[in-house]
Amino acid sequence: MRIAVVTQKIVRHDGQGRVNAVVVEEFLRRGHEVVAIATEVADELARHPSLRWMPVDGGGVPTQLARDQLFAWRASRALARARRAGIDRVVVNGFVSWARSDVNAVHFVHSAWMRSPTHPVRKSLSPLSLYRALYTLLNVGFERWSFRRAGRLVAVSRTVAEELRRDGIDPARLAVIDNGVDVAEFQPGKPDPTLFGLPPGRPVALFVGDARSDRKNLDGVLRALAEVPDLSLAVVGDKRGGPFPALARSLGVEERVRFLGHRRDVAALMQAADLFVFPTRYEPFGLVLLEAAASGLPVVTTRLAGASWLLEDGAAVVLDDPDAQDALVAAMRRLAADPEERRRMGEAGRRIAERHDWPVTAGRYVDLLEAMGPLASGVGLSGTLVRSTS
């Protein structure tokens, strides 16, 4: 088959981009051709003889909302050109195009985020919070429109599937394909605080995620750290313009915290840490949770992370409420003090991760496409619109 994949990034150093990259690799491994309609494609994929990259630039405009719209418009035009040349299947990721698709892989549900009690607009009516609310609400409409124009929807977790059902999506159109992990790249290692620029003598908790907003609850982690003096913290993620370095200073923990910014060596950093803390307030999946488990790290997270249910069998402390500060402090204190429990949980996490290696996950995407009828997207091979039978 000739498969068009429409998404912004097909790279390994980005959460959603990593999913796209491993799925595209599996398409190519099974002998399919791929047309990648994207802003960025990993070099090794762009050089593959069976992949054609149609670059789409979504930049040059001042806001993310405008960039998303520009990308969708340009991607739709590129897809129309690709269809004229012959396309058998179209795979998109959420709202990235105005065109129809065979499969829409859903990594985030804006309606669920809008309903969340931790959405920024419920805490503040500042201009930034109001812009984020507008961005979310508009994306609710764009996503629902895009979902209606897809033959099948793939939810990347049970959490996402439930959110889609709540929004009225017919369960018969839904498939759940949990994200996976590269167990060869993410492997257990030996803790080394000096890799983070931290002195020896204390275990290191690692946090990986956006360090500019409070959705992933870095503020809660820093406040908990202030009550666990025998623990250090390394933070990986873009912190530009974020409030958390100042919060660390105000809490008096800045000497035990290192803000490392965006890094591409996350696997090496996980090997050097002692535990992973990610008490998110909303996360449709959370690739970093499986990556931490594969690295042999005990995990502290919440039920609001889509991947949390995978780790409940002895690999994680799963909190019911991300804002239950006493419970977060207790979990961090317990793991900081007990290396034997860290070891047991890390071994359990590694066993779980090995059952979710990326080739298995990516293969399920290919199986789904290969099993679909030829007109699943409502678009014939020539690009002529027909009535969908899904």
Predicted regions and their residues:
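Acceptor-binding helix/loop patch of EC 2.4 sugar-transfer enzymes
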Residues: 101-144, 184
